[in-house]
Amino acid sequence: MAATLLYNRNNVSQLPFDTAAMDPQVLQKEMDDAFQADPALGWCLNRGTAPNVKHVRQCRSWDCGLACIQMVARLRNDALTFKEISKLCGNITSIWTVHLSSVLLQRNIAHAIVTTCAGVNQDLESLSFYQDHIEQEKNDVLRLFNTSINNGIRIIESGYSGVNFKHLLLTRRVVLIMLVDNRGLRCTDCGCMKRNWFSCGFTGHYVLVQGYDEEREAFVYHDPADRVQKCWMTLLQFDQCRLVKGTDEDVVVVPY
């Protein structure tokens, strides 16, 4: 993988994918290590109560990540507005996962980043979704990664299967802000694809995953582009929409 990486990588954990894939608990152990260091956080077991996520719709084509941040803020009774989030992002319209981390950091919201590239993946230049602006944004993205790391945000640089995230959601009180290919989102409740897979190339989109429903055997998520309050996707669909070139398998893990 061609990538522009960080200079300061003291807080970046690197795990081989095979290790993560074989042990469903490996991600949970990483999160335990990341969050138990903060006794004020109250990092605790999932007692079977799903979080009361208030659905937020995005306002424009590019602000799905901001809508996910607002849903997280509402979980914490933080009345953060779109305007305030946009200002914390620097009033830009090209949002990377590390911009979302920056907002959470500025609001003192504990979180960790899971990604296959803690930096700028130059392979993304081949995708039309990125190619017009990746060079101009590279320095800003690297600066924000370093800021997050220097402020103690844990970054785990590894690939994980959906089984790892299923186990984490069932055993720990967390929500996930997840970068997906918008073409691959499929809600099992309505039974149809949200977007046409063949209509265009990769289209990055953020969704908020609030838990795993064992009765339905599906992840529960909020799509900011949809009026529907909750959607569901199977383990297979979960991986199909995120394990694609363009996402770097980015997930922001936020305890609540």
Where are the language model's segments positioned?
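Surface-exposed loop/turn and secondary-structure junction residues enriched for glycine/proline
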Residues: 56-59, 88, 158, 188, ...
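Noncatalytic regulatory segments and standalone regulatory/sensor domains
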Residues: 2-41, 170-171, 181-256
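Residue-level detector of short, conserved catalytic/binding motifs and their immediate flanks
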Residues: 62, 176, 207
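Helix N-cap and loop-to-helix transition residues
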Residues: 63, 81-82, 96, 161, ...
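Active-site nucleophile-adjacent alpha helix/oxyanion-hole segment immediately C-terminal to the catalytic cysteine
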Residues: 2-121
